[in-house]
Amino acid sequence: MSKVYFTRNINSESLIKIYKALGIELPGKVGIKVSTGEDGARGYLKQQLIAPLVKELNGTIIECNTAYGGSRAVTSKHIETVRKHGFYNYAEVDIMDSEGEFKIPVKNGKHLKYDLVGKNIANYDSMLNLAHGKGHAMGGFGGNIKNQSIGIASSKGKAYIHSVGQTEDVIKCWSAKYQQEEFIESMAEAAKAVSDYFEEHKKPIAYITVMNFLSVDCDCDANQSDPVMNDLGIVASLDPVANDQAFMDLVFSSREEGAKKLQERVDTRCGRHILEYGEQIGLGSTKYELIDIDK
């Protein structure tokens, strides 16, 4: 059974504390995968919260360009958005597909034959997958699995996942026909490909999800709606499925009235299917022990 650490406190000290609770040393050049947030979005993780941990790990913020236009579709505009959102104030930022991409295999994929990732991912010795937990218009919710699949894919790779393996074209991908469950499964397959790639190269990954600004919309939405429920805290694990499962369990066990809106967003998009499918393909376990570090 996987261990998931939990704190209700969301501040820079508790973020460092929960990372240390994992008992893992991220060696060498550390990539810290966050969502840099679309211009206009408000939920992305802010400097005040994450800068001390990023500095402690001497980490580089890593991200890839998007596949839907907007303020992060090309590197030059993406860099402007990153600067506007304050990431350059405390870290180096690497738009990993700015100089190209490469394919990594999806083993026994039902939908994807490969995952197309930002070329510079190869430069990192370890990774902290630092997700902002929230809803998502297409995936139902975004946590560590989405951050590792869509997030590490190049813009063409994102198109390939969004089209369930039909095209790498960033225009054509949006008119591809598929069942919703197939898209959810494609995200899990891409995340597993990244896990496999890191494991084969003996590069560890740690997973943290900050459950604040709980909007039904993702940080990739320039018109991100207001939070629908109160902040829940932070979860951390070495297992991305367990960590996302814990996030969903906290959302679905909430008795807050507004939580129903996020629950509805998740379930109308078959969002929790990514957990059972992720477990099925060996990405992680839905069974976990929750360790409350506040006690």
Segments predicted by a language model, with ranges:
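Extended, low-polarity segments enriched in aliphatic/aromatic residues
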Residues: 1-56, 60-295
